[in-house]
């Protein structure tokens, strides 16, 4: 069932140009269709991708752009054919709001690999209307791309799980790396990396954090529970780790050499790339051939994996380490994020902010 035209206007904070500066922006929500869920947004995490998109770092940004793809809110209306949700449910929306439904990935419930997937923002619906993200009062999303937040999970803690959490959970699940006793490495300790440590530890893995400096050692070992911490340039320590890891999750989003991390892998070990890097990466093929090692990639996660991940995090008592901010601080938060000055994820308190300011 639809909603009144007067109620279809909402306000978000949008970037207007590649400066990336956000300010209030009023726009029209799409009508609530038969399978749509209308959501009053409570909070939204800030991902590094939001920074790239608002500044047009990837060369494909469209403005005005309301970012945000780690959205948690309350259902205020459901379409006539919605069966999964009722008014009052606390729900989440991640990176996607649409897919074709008929391709091979969609048929396998891997909609994140659909060639016609629709992003939560900086994209268009099939009718040509722009998609807008979670830095706003409300959003309307097809029920397929909405998940229930487990009862008892704090909304601000749930938000980063919808991107950072599922991004590391998905490859561990898909590549058969969930069983206890494995030895893994997490390269890079940002928003995704810190959840990688937590999730891998909760699966019973021995986890080594690999970083470029010592500044996060204490946090990694004491706050996140990592078993070891290695500086990538420490040749002696890296040599000690050679041929010892079942996998390395590489979250680094800038160009870097792969050989040092390939050398850490056991026979059949996997180097799983997650950082978006536009420059070609190089490696020596014998490093792969002589250990039957694998370089692979993984991209966010499916809706089924997102649901599994949320239940896993609830069961294990996992949460993100976050800093909650108001919307009027968001531009400063973006500046700090660009300098990696956050431990480990900003979450915008949308409900408690004046978006019209």
Curated annotation (Swiss-Prot):
It catalyses: (E)-cinnamyl alcohol + NADP(+) = (E)-cinnamaldehyde + NADPH + H(+); (E)-coniferol + NADP(+) = (E)-coniferaldehyde + NADPH + H(+); (E)-sinapyl alcohol + NADP(+) = (E)-sinapaldehyde + NADPH + H(+); (E)-4-coumaroyl alcohol + NADP(+) = (E)-4-coumaraldehyde + NADPH + H(+). Zn(2+) 2 binds at residues 100, 103, 106, 114. Binds 2 Zn(2+) ions per subunit. One of its GO terms (cellular component) is cytosol. Its cofactor is Zn(2+). InterPro entries: ADH-like_C (IPR013149), ADH-like_N (IPR013154), ADH_Zn_CS (IPR002328), CAD-like (IPR047109), GroES-like_sf (IPR011032), NAD(P)-bd_dom_sf (IPR036291), PKS_ER (IPR020843). Pathway: Aromatic compound metabolism; phenylpropanoid biosynthesis. Zn(2+) 1 binds at residues 47, 69-70, 163. Keywords: Lignin biosynthesis, Metal-binding, NADP, Oxidoreductase, Zinc. Disruption phenotype: Reduced lignin content and rigidity of the floral stems. It comes from the Eukaryota. GO terms for biological process: lignin biosynthetic process. Expressed at the lateral root initiation sites, in the vascular tissues of the primary lateral root and the root caps. Expressed in the hypocotyl, cotyledon and leaf veins, apical meristem region, at the base of the trichomes, hydathodes and cauline leaves. In stems, expressed in the cells associated with the vascular cambium, interfascicular cambium and the developing xylem. Expressed in the vascular strand of petals and sepals, anthers, stamen filaments, stigma in flowers, and abscission, style and stigmatic regions of siliques. One of its GO terms (molecular function) is coniferyl-alcohol dehydrogenase activity. Homodimer. Involved in lignin biosynthesis in the floral stem. Catalyzes the final step specific for the production of lignin monomers. Catalyzes the NADPH-dependent reduction of coniferaldehyde, 5-hydroxyconiferaldehyde, sinapaldehyde, 4-coumaraldehyde and caffeyl aldehyde to their respective alcohols. Belongs to the zinc-containing alcohol dehydrogenase family. This is Cinnamyl alcohol dehydrogenase 5. The lineage of its organism: Eukaryota, Viridiplantae, Streptophyta, Embryophyta, Tracheophyta.
């Amino acid at each position: 069932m639809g909603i009144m035209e007067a109620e279809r206007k909402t306000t978000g904070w949008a970037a207007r140009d590649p400066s990336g500066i956000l300010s209030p922006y009023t726009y029209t929500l799409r009508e609530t269709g038969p399978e749509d869920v209308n959501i009053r947004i409570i909070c939204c995490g800030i991902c590094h991708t939001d920074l790239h998109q608002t500044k047009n770092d990837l060369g494909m940004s469209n403005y005005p752009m309301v970012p945000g793809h780690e959205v948690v809110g309350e259902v205020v209306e459901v379409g006539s054919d919605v069966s999964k949700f009722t008014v009052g449910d606390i729900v989440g929306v991640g990176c996607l709001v649409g897919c074709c439904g008929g391709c091979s990935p969609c048929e396998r419930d891997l909609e994140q690999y659909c060639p016609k997937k629709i992003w939560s923002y900086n994209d268009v619906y099939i009718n040509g209307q722009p998609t807008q993200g979670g830095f706003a009062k409300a959003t309307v999303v097809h029920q397929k791309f909405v998940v229930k937040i487990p009862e008892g999970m704090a909304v601000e803690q749930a938000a980063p799980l919808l991107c950072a959490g599922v991004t590391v959970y998905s490859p561990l699940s898909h590549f058969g790396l969930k069983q206890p006793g494995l030895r893994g490495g997490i390269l890079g300790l940002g928003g995704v990396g810190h959840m990688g440590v937590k999730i891998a530890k909760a699966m019973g893995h021995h986890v080594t954090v690999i970083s470029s400096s010592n500044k996060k050692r204490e946090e990694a070992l004491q706050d996140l529970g990592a078993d070891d911490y290695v500086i990538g340039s420490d040749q002696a320590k890296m040599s000690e780790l050679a041929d010892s890891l079942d996998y390395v999750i590489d979250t680094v989003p800038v160009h870097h050499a792969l050989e040092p991390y390939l050398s850490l892998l056991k026979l059949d070990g996997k180097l799983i790339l997650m950082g978006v890097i536009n420059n070609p990466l190089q490696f020596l093929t014998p490093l792969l051939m002589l250990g039957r090692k694998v370089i692979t990639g993984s991209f966010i996660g499916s809706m089924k994996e997102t649901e599994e991940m949320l239940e896993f995090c609830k069961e294990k008592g996992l949460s993100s380490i976050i800093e909650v901010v108001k919307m009027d601080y968001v531009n400063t938060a973006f500046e700090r994020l660009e300098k990696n000055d956050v431990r480990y994820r900003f979450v915008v308190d949308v409900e408690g902010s004046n978006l019209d300011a």
